[in-house]
Amino acid sequence: MIPAAFDYVAPSTVDEAVQAL
């Protein structure tokens, strides 16, 4: 998927997911 799509859906959630990694 396009990163922009994730940022549009929920940047906070994505950021947390990245930290989880």
UniProtKB/Swiss-Prot annotation:
Record InterPro entries = FAD-bd_PCMH_sub1
Q: What is its EC number?
A: 1.2.99.-
Keywords, ordered alphabetically: Oxidoreductase
Is Ligase a UniProt keyword of this protein? Answer: no
Nucleus as a keyword of this entry, yes or no, is no
What GO terms are given for molecular function? oxidoreductase activity
State the source organism's domain of life: Bacteria
Which proteins does it associate with, and in what oligomeric form? Heterotrimer composed of an alpha, a beta and a gamma chain.
Can you name this protein?
Formate ester dehydrogenase beta chain
